[in-house]
Amino acid sequence: MNKKYLPSALIMYLNYFIHGVGCSILGQAVIKEALAAAWGVEAMAITAISAALGLGRLIALPFAGPLSDKLGRRISTAIGSASYAVYLIGLAFAFSSGQNGGYQIAYVCAIIGGISNSFLDTGIYPAVAEIISSAPGVATMGIKFFIAIAQMLLPFVLGVAVTTTATGMVSYNPLFIGCGIIYAVLFVLIFLFPLPDSEQKAGGKSEGLIASLKHTNFSFESIAMIVIGFTCTGT
Protein backbone atom coordinates (compact mmCIF):
# COMPACT_ATOMS: atom_id res chain seq x y z
CA MET A 1 0.00 0.00 0.00
CA ASN A 2 1.26 3.45 -0.91
CA LYS A 3 1.82 5.33 2.36
CA LYS A 4 0.29 8.51 0.96
CA TYR A 5 -3.09 6.72 0.99
CA LEU A 6 -2.84 5.71 4.67
CA PRO A 7 -4.77 8.76 6.01
CA SER A 8 -7.43 8.17 3.35
CA ALA A 9 -7.84 4.55 4.44
CA LEU A 10 -8.14 5.62 8.08
CA ILE A 11 -10.87 8.14 7.17
CA MET A 12 -12.74 5.40 5.31
CA TYR A 13 -12.53 3.04 8.26
CA LEU A 14 -13.61 5.75 10.72
CA ASN A 15 -16.75 6.21 8.64
CA TYR A 16 -17.62 2.60 9.34
CA PHE A 17 -16.62 2.85 12.97
CA ILE A 18 -19.31 5.50 13.50
CA HIS A 19 -21.62 3.54 11.20
CA GLY A 20 -21.27 0.65 13.65
CA VAL A 21 -22.91 2.91 16.23
CA GLY A 22 -25.47 4.40 13.85
CA CYS A 23 -26.76 1.08 12.57
CA SER A 24 -27.09 -0.34 16.10
CA ILE A 25 -28.57 2.45 18.20
CA LEU A 26 -32.19 1.87 17.20
CA GLY A 27 -31.84 -1.76 18.25
CA GLN A 28 -30.83 -0.86 21.82
CA ALA A 29 -33.66 -1.39 24.30
CA VAL A 30 -32.83 1.71 26.35
CA ILE A 31 -32.90 3.94 23.26
CA LYS A 32 -36.15 2.38 22.06
CA GLU A 33 -37.73 3.13 25.41
CA ALA A 34 -36.44 6.72 25.46
CA LEU A 35 -37.67 7.44 21.92
CA ALA A 36 -41.02 5.74 22.51
CA ALA A 37 -41.56 7.82 25.64
CA ALA A 38 -40.69 11.03 23.78
CA TRP A 39 -43.05 10.28 20.88
CA GLY A 40 -45.87 8.75 22.91
CA VAL A 41 -45.78 5.41 21.08
CA GLU A 42 -45.15 1.78 22.01
CA ALA A 43 -41.55 0.59 21.98
CA MET A 44 -42.44 -1.83 19.17
CA ALA A 45 -43.29 1.16 16.96
CA ILE A 46 -39.59 2.03 16.89
CA THR A 47 -39.13 -1.13 14.79
CA ALA A 48 -40.75 0.74 11.89
CA ILE A 49 -38.04 3.39 12.15
CA SER A 50 -35.40 0.65 11.96
CA ALA A 51 -37.18 -0.79 8.91
CA ALA A 52 -36.98 2.64 7.25
CA LEU A 53 -33.19 2.25 7.24
CA GLY A 54 -33.60 -0.83 5.06
CA LEU A 55 -36.09 0.99 2.84
CA GLY A 56 -33.66 3.84 2.27
CA ARG A 57 -30.91 1.40 1.41
CA LEU A 58 -33.12 -0.35 -1.16
CA ILE A 59 -34.05 3.01 -2.71
CA ALA A 60 -30.41 3.98 -3.23
CA LEU A 61 -28.87 0.64 -4.22
CA PRO A 62 -29.83 0.71 -7.95
CA PHE A 63 -27.97 3.97 -8.60
CA ALA A 64 -25.41 4.26 -5.77
CA GLY A 65 -23.03 1.78 -7.41
CA PRO A 66 -23.08 3.29 -10.92
CA LEU A 67 -22.72 6.78 -9.42
CA SER A 68 -19.68 5.61 -7.46
CA ASP A 69 -18.10 4.28 -10.67
CA LYS A 70 -18.97 7.44 -12.59
CA LEU A 71 -18.25 10.17 -10.02
CA GLY A 72 -15.58 8.37 -7.99
CA ARG A 73 -15.26 6.84 -4.53
CA ARG A 74 -14.65 10.24 -2.94
CA ILE A 75 -18.02 11.68 -4.01
CA SER A 76 -19.91 8.51 -3.10
CA THR A 77 -18.31 8.43 0.36
CA ALA A 78 -18.94 12.16 0.84
CA ILE A 79 -22.64 11.71 0.01
CA GLY A 80 -22.80 8.86 2.51
CA SER A 81 -21.06 10.84 5.27
CA ALA A 82 -23.22 13.93 4.77
CA SER A 83 -26.42 11.87 4.67
CA TYR A 84 -25.45 9.99 7.82
CA ALA A 85 -24.86 13.29 9.61
CA VAL A 86 -28.37 14.38 8.59
CA TYR A 87 -29.79 11.09 9.85
CA LEU A 88 -28.12 11.21 13.26
CA ILE A 89 -28.65 14.90 13.98
CA GLY A 90 -32.18 14.49 12.63
CA LEU A 91 -32.84 11.81 15.24
CA ALA A 92 -31.85 14.27 17.96
CA PHE A 93 -34.19 16.87 16.47
CA ALA A 94 -36.97 14.28 16.24
CA PHE A 95 -36.53 13.38 19.92
CA SER A 96 -36.70 17.05 20.91
CA SER A 97 -39.84 17.50 18.78
CA GLY A 98 -41.61 14.92 20.93
CA GLN A 99 -45.19 14.23 19.90
CA ASN A 100 -45.22 17.24 17.56
CA GLY A 101 -44.19 15.22 14.52
CA GLY A 102 -41.08 13.67 16.07
CA TYR A 103 -41.94 10.13 14.96
CA GLN A 104 -42.54 11.22 11.36
CA ILE A 105 -39.30 13.23 11.31
CA ALA A 106 -37.38 10.20 12.58
CA TYR A 107 -38.90 8.00 9.86
CA VAL A 108 -37.76 10.38 7.10
CA CYS A 109 -34.31 10.69 8.69
CA ALA A 110 -34.04 6.90 8.88
CA ILE A 111 -34.72 6.63 5.14
CA ILE A 112 -31.91 9.15 4.60
CA GLY A 113 -29.73 7.01 6.87
CA GLY A 114 -30.43 3.96 4.72
CA ILE A 115 -29.54 5.91 1.58
CA SER A 116 -26.28 6.98 3.22
CA ASN A 117 -25.50 3.34 4.00
CA SER A 118 -25.72 2.44 0.31
CA PHE A 119 -23.41 5.27 -0.69
CA LEU A 120 -20.89 4.37 2.02
CA ASP A 121 -20.91 0.75 0.84
CA THR A 122 -20.41 1.61 -2.83
CA GLY A 123 -17.76 4.21 -2.03
CA ILE A 124 -15.71 2.72 0.77
CA TYR A 125 -15.60 -1.00 -0.08
CA PRO A 126 -13.99 -0.46 -3.50
CA ALA A 127 -11.90 2.45 -2.18
CA VAL A 128 -10.15 0.42 0.52
CA ALA A 129 -9.72 -2.47 -1.93
CA GLU A 130 -8.02 -0.06 -4.35
CA ILE A 131 -5.87 1.45 -1.58
CA ILE A 132 -4.75 -1.97 -0.25
CA SER A 133 -4.68 -3.55 -3.70
CA SER A 134 -2.21 -6.25 -2.66
CA ALA A 135 -4.68 -7.64 -0.08
CA PRO A 136 -8.24 -6.51 -0.92
CA GLY A 137 -9.72 -9.25 1.26
CA VAL A 138 -7.89 -7.89 4.30
CA ALA A 139 -9.03 -4.38 3.36
CA THR A 140 -12.71 -5.32 3.42
CA MET A 141 -12.26 -7.37 6.59
CA GLY A 142 -10.97 -4.17 8.19
CA ILE A 143 -14.38 -2.59 7.61
CA LYS A 144 -16.10 -5.38 9.54
CA PHE A 145 -13.46 -5.06 12.26
CA PHE A 146 -14.18 -1.36 12.80
CA ILE A 147 -17.94 -1.99 12.85
CA ALA A 148 -17.51 -4.79 15.40
CA ILE A 149 -15.31 -2.65 17.66
CA ALA A 150 -17.88 0.17 17.60
CA GLN A 151 -20.72 -2.20 18.45
CA MET A 152 -18.68 -3.70 21.28
CA LEU A 153 -18.05 -0.24 22.77
CA LEU A 154 -21.63 1.01 22.27
CA PRO A 155 -23.03 -0.24 25.63
CA PHE A 156 -20.29 1.65 27.47
CA VAL A 157 -20.88 4.78 25.38
CA LEU A 158 -24.60 4.65 26.18
CA GLY A 159 -23.80 4.84 29.87
CA VAL A 160 -21.77 8.01 29.33
CA ALA A 161 -24.02 9.70 26.76
CA VAL A 162 -27.30 9.45 28.66
CA THR A 163 -28.77 12.71 29.98
CA THR A 164 -32.05 13.86 31.48
CA THR A 165 -34.20 16.60 29.96
CA ALA A 166 -35.84 19.44 31.88
CA THR A 167 -39.05 17.41 31.90
CA GLY A 168 -37.28 14.42 33.45
CA MET A 169 -37.13 12.30 30.28
CA VAL A 170 -34.12 10.15 29.47
CA SER A 171 -32.28 11.46 26.39
CA TYR A 172 -29.46 10.12 24.23
CA ASN A 173 -29.23 13.25 22.10
CA PRO A 174 -25.55 13.83 22.99
CA LEU A 175 -24.75 10.50 21.30
CA PHE A 176 -26.80 11.33 18.19
CA ILE A 177 -25.37 14.83 17.86
CA GLY A 178 -21.80 13.76 18.65
CA CYS A 179 -21.80 11.04 15.99
CA GLY A 180 -23.43 13.43 13.53
CA ILE A 181 -20.69 16.01 14.10
CA ILE A 182 -18.00 13.36 13.59
CA TYR A 183 -19.58 12.47 10.25
CA ALA A 184 -19.60 16.15 9.28
CA VAL A 185 -15.86 16.30 10.05
CA LEU A 186 -15.23 13.12 8.04
CA PHE A 187 -17.17 14.69 5.16
CA VAL A 188 -14.64 17.53 5.08
CA LEU A 189 -11.60 15.27 5.53
CA ILE A 190 -12.52 13.01 2.61
CA PHE A 191 -11.81 15.91 0.25
CA LEU A 192 -8.39 16.64 1.74
CA PHE A 193 -6.57 13.36 1.04
CA PRO A 194 -5.82 11.48 -2.20
CA LEU A 195 -7.60 8.36 -3.46
CA PRO A 196 -6.36 5.99 -6.19
CA ASP A 197 -9.50 6.23 -8.34
CA SER A 198 -9.25 10.04 -8.48
CA GLU A 199 -5.79 9.83 -10.01
CA GLN A 200 -6.88 7.13 -12.45
CA LYS A 201 -9.84 9.22 -13.63
CA ALA A 202 -7.53 12.15 -14.25
CA GLY A 203 -5.62 10.03 -16.75
CA GLY A 204 -8.54 8.62 -18.73
CA LYS A 205 -12.19 8.90 -19.62
CA SER A 206 -14.62 6.80 -17.61
CA GLU A 207 -17.79 5.16 -18.91
CA GLY A 208 -20.97 7.20 -18.59
CA LEU A 209 -23.63 6.39 -16.01
CA ILE A 210 -26.32 5.41 -18.55
CA ALA A 211 -23.88 3.24 -20.50
CA SER A 212 -22.81 1.56 -17.27
CA LEU A 213 -26.42 0.77 -16.39
CA LYS A 214 -27.04 -0.69 -19.87
CA HIS A 215 -24.14 -3.11 -19.42
CA THR A 216 -25.38 -4.33 -16.03
CA ASN A 217 -25.89 -8.10 -16.09
CA PHE A 218 -27.10 -10.34 -13.27
CA SER A 219 -25.75 -13.89 -13.45
CA PHE A 220 -26.97 -16.81 -11.34
CA GLU A 221 -23.93 -16.38 -9.10
CA SER A 222 -24.53 -12.65 -8.59
CA ILE A 223 -28.18 -13.29 -7.66
CA ALA A 224 -27.04 -15.96 -5.18
CA MET A 225 -24.59 -13.48 -3.63
CA ILE A 226 -27.37 -10.89 -3.30
CA VAL A 227 -29.57 -13.45 -1.50
CA ILE A 228 -26.71 -14.36 0.84
CA GLY A 229 -26.06 -10.69 1.55
CA PHE A 230 -29.74 -10.11 2.32
CA THR A 231 -30.07 -13.07 4.69
CA CYS A 232 -26.76 -12.60 6.53
CA THR A 233 -27.48 -8.93 7.29
CA GLY A 234 -31.11 -9.70 8.13
CA THR A 235 -30.02 -11.99 10.94
Segments predicted by a language model, with ranges:
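Small-residue-rich segments within alpha-helical transmembrane domains of MFS-like 12-TM solute carriers
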Residues: 20, 24, 114-122, 152, ...
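Residue-level signature of mid-helix packing/kink "hotspots" within the transmembrane helices
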Residues: 53-62, 152
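Pair of pore-lining "gating" transmembrane helices in MFS-fold secondary transporters
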Residues: 2-28, 217-234
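Flexible cytoplasmic inter-helical loops of multi-pass small-molecule transporters
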Residues: 192-211
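Juxtamembrane helix-start elements in MFS-like secondary transporters
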Residues: 41-50, 102, 106, 140
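Conserved MFS/SLC helix-loop-helix module at the cytosolic interface between two early adjacent transmembrane helices
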Residues: 59-99
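Cytoplasmic helix-loop-helix junction between adjacent transmembrane helices
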Residues: 109-145
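Helix-loop-helix hairpin linking two adjacent transmembrane segments in secondary transporters
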Residues: 134-135, 139-194
